[in-house]
Amino acid sequence: MSKEKALESALSQIEKQFGKGSIMRLGDQETAHDIDVIPSGIIALDVALGIGGYPKGRIIEIYGHESSGKTTLTLLAIAQCQKQGGVAAFIDAEHALDPKYAKLLGVDVDNLIVSQPDTGEQALEIADMLVRSGGIDIVVIDSVAALTPKAEIEGDMGDSHMGLQARLMSQALRKLTANIKRSNTLVMFINQIRMKIGVMFGNPETTTGGNALKFYASVRLEVRKGGSIKDGVDVSGNEIKVKIVKNKVAPPFKQAEFELIYGEGISLEAELIDLGAKYEIIEKSGAWYSYKGKKIGQGKEKSKEYLKENTLERDEIEKALLQLLLPQKYAVQEQVQPEPKSKQSKSKQASEQATQDELI
């Protein structure tokens, strides 16, 4: 057997044993498109994830510095899930969920299942019970850092509790993983960044809760703040950069950039202008942006305002981008042309004649 055949045999055996997407070539564009996904609500992020959204039946970790947009990303995923008719749960260990902001992002807060647990054990047990029920499509846990072990809560303030949280996470994830796969539920953990003490070389940053989540997560997203967005003198938002640092269902290390506007969420219009200009769906000449030969604005801010007011053109641009960048999810459906009446009558006569011949 040649090396190529032996390798192909091994790859097919691995896929059969561990599932599609468990192994691939890094430059392979044909990723596992048949994996069920929940869209992120951000086109650039759906493209970076490689399969058009977050994979169901998997664990996702989103981590970053404070106010970098981690919770916003999870709420957008919940909104997309609910639009598809799914059921979502939010385990608010930080006790900081803002219903008004969630509603602004498109979340149906009346039907969102929310829990504010007292201990880390309680939070993870609730998550496991929801997953095992099979009736939940997405569970968000905000955040790993707030999953305080019961022993730490009941102990005194100065007591040492080395490794308790890491042990708790390790036990919970061992239990959760099989149930998540079986019920095809998407479980998203929000995590925070801490600094390692005494690191002279390399990256001193790490995430809380030990190493278990790093191993069990199929996708890990690193969220960072970019530059500020100004409305005159005032800062109205900031740029967000998301890096896919781990991806088991598509090639990793891709990046997505978009704008987060304070009090509004992710700016769809800014994303459409940036991606539209990049892929020549929108023409850019100097400071002017044009669509189908018609000028839509001078500068990005004016163009954003135009798209906000003209939703029909905005939807057209969005559809064109989705079909271009995610053809496996948003393929252009060819319309089946109806047969002319003369052909229909001829085929009908032929079928009737064939039936009569069979009877004879």
UniProtKB/Swiss-Prot annotation:
Main location: cytoplasm
Pfam families xrefs: RecA, RecA_C
Keyword DNA-binding on entry: yes
An example Gene Ontology molecular-function term: ATP binding
Amino acids binding ATP: G64, H65, E66, S67, S68, G69, K70, T71
GO biological process, one term: DNA repair
Disulfide bonds: none
Location(s) in or outside the cell: Cytoplasm
Keyword ATP-binding in annotation: yes
GO CC annotation: cytosol
Keywords (A to Z) from UniProt: ATP-binding, Cytoplasm, DNA damage, DNA recombination, DNA repair, DNA-binding, Nucleotide-binding, SOS response
Region Disordered: start-end pairs: 333-360
PANTHER family listed in its UniProt record: MITOCHONDRIAL DNA REPAIR PROTEIN RECA HOMOLOG-RELATED (PTHR45900:SF1), RECA (PTHR45900)
Role: Can catalyze the hydrolysis of ATP in the presence of single-stranded DNA, the ATP-dependent uptake of single-stranded DNA by duplex DNA, and the ATP-dependent hybridization of homologous single-stranded DNAs. It interacts with LexA causing its activation and leading to its autocatalytic cleavage.
Homology family: Belongs to the RecA family.
The name this protein goes by in its record: Protein RecA
Species the sequence originates in: Francisella philomiragia subsp. philomiragia (strain ATCC 25017 / CCUG 19701 / FSC 153 / O#319-036)
Name of encoding gene: recA
